[in-house]
């Protein structure tokens, strides 16, 4: 007799409280988490920072380190803790490949675990991975803002326009009001 096992793990009730909405943007400190991989994400966060500030928020940009050893990872963790300790809202991206999606979601969940309203940003191609990673940490209800894939390799002016076109949806995904 042959037994066939499902490769899917058993479902566990890990769901944590829902991600809180932002509410009014005016007066909030919105943290935009960048990495060192995607120039297109720098352009997007530049555009979103301008739009957030026009809506009355203050923006703080933090660049995640590239982990090359224990020292960099420890220092990066300390810097991130300081970053999320000084913001009211976290926007973590960009999930655009396997490892960058892992770290963007890791940092989003870290912010959410402190009670911050949080949005993870992934490209459409990496949505499923991002949601799976968040669910593994008990956040199957993480707010995820989807962006088109691919972004990298497009002309700068096109990427900046995409950012502007997606800003209203970012605000809606945050549960924010302008």
Tell me the role of every PLM-derived stretch.
Residues 10-17, 71-84:
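Glycine-rich, highly charged phosphate/nucleotide-binding loops
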Residues 22-23, 27-59:
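Glycine-rich phosphate/diphosphate-binding loop of Rossmann-like nucleotide-binding domains
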Residues 1-26:
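Short N-terminal or domain-adjacent regulatory/targeting segments
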Residues 52-66, 141-148:
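Short beta-strand elements in bilobed, periplasmic/extracellular small-molecule ligand-binding domains
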Residues 145-178:
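A charged, well-structured terminal subsegment
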Residues 126-138:
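Glycine-rich, charge-decorated loop segments at or immediately adjacent to ligand/cofactor-binding or catalytic sites
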Residues 104-129, 145:
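Short, acidic/small-residue loops that bind anionic groups at enzyme active sites
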């Amino acid at each position: 007799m042959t037994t066939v096992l499902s490769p899917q793990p058993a479902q566990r009730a890990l769901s944590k409280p829902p991600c809180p909405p932002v509410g009014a943007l005016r007066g909030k400190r919105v943290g935009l988490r960048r990495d060192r991989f995607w120039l297109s994400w720098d352009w997007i966060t530049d555009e979103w920072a301008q739009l957030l500030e026009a809506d009355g928020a203050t923006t703080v940009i933090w660049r995640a380190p590239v982990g090359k050893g224990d020292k960099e990872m420890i220092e990066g963790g300390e810097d991130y803790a300081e970053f999320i300790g000084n913001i009211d809202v976290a926007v973590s991206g960009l999930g655009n490949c396997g490892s960058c999606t892992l770290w963007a979601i890791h940092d989003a969940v870290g912010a959410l675990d402190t009670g911050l309203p949080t949005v993870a940003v992934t490209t459409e191609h990496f949505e499923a991975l991002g949601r799976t990673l968040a669910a593994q940490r008990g956040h199957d209800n993480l707010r995820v803002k989807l962006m088109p894939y691919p972004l990298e390799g497009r002309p700068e002016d096109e990427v900046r326009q995409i950012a502007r076109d997606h800003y209203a949806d970012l605000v809606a995904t945050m549960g924010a009001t302008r």
